[in-house]
Amino acid sequence: MSINNSYFSRNNTIIYNDLTNTGRNPVTELYYGEDGIVNPRGFSRFIFDIDLSLLIEKVNNGIVSTGCTSAMTHTLNMTNTSYFDKDFLNTSTSQGRYRATSFDLFLFRIPPNNSTIPPTPQIWDEGVGYDFISANTPIPNDKNYSDRPSNWSAITTIDTWEEPGIYSNTNSGSFNYNSLQVIDTQHFEFGDENIDFDMTNEINSILNGSITTPVGWGIAYLPQVESLSGTTGTYSVGFFTRHTQTFYEPYLQTNYNDLIEDDRNMFVLGKINKLYLYVYEDGDFKNLDFNPFVEL
């Protein structure tokens, strides 16, 4: 069994009805509920893209010999910022938000813009923002806060999402939740669990060409949670992003079975025997352009 790790190429947290960009923040804070900090009621969603170039190269070069089969699996791993200390359970953050418990997060593919013919990929920029709110500082230019794209409304300076926030959680917009391609859903009982979404079918479909021009994925609370009313506070969960300066950078882990076993030591009559051919050129392994014919 071998492992290949693919890392994020960009990520951002977008905030309901807000132009704030947090692309450079080392933590994504997914929250819902009453929020006097940013909005009277709000929630956030996390978007990201993965650099699959090394994995694609390994598949094309035959290093990953399994092909896009069940022998190759892909899991998205993100570390919870509360994972390390159980004392964080049932407490609040420095901003006064309660740590969320008993909730589901789902992983979805960012859809194309279906208002164009043909539909066009919604290619978004990560942005240069850091803070979730503008700091009250006498410094004229707060370089940690930015309202430049991407954000809830815009993907670039001149382009917007087909639907603000990517989709409508009330199914009343130009692109709705019930039209999303949901990849996986995970339940969080205590709120300190790590993310481990299964992306096997999704990534294999990209590798075999079934999915073309992907522009990334998103993570969000279920619409029923985002739309909760009557809450007396804000509830949040945090995960490390690609900008963390720690070991806990998020990644896609690919596991593939490249164990080669044949019957060279048990080659007998009366059964199907398997042999592997190793081809060398100047002492190095070489891939063939076509299947060879061998006479025994």
Please report, for each region that a protein language model flagged, where it lies by residue.
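Secreted, disulfide-rich extracellular signaling modules
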Residues: 1-296
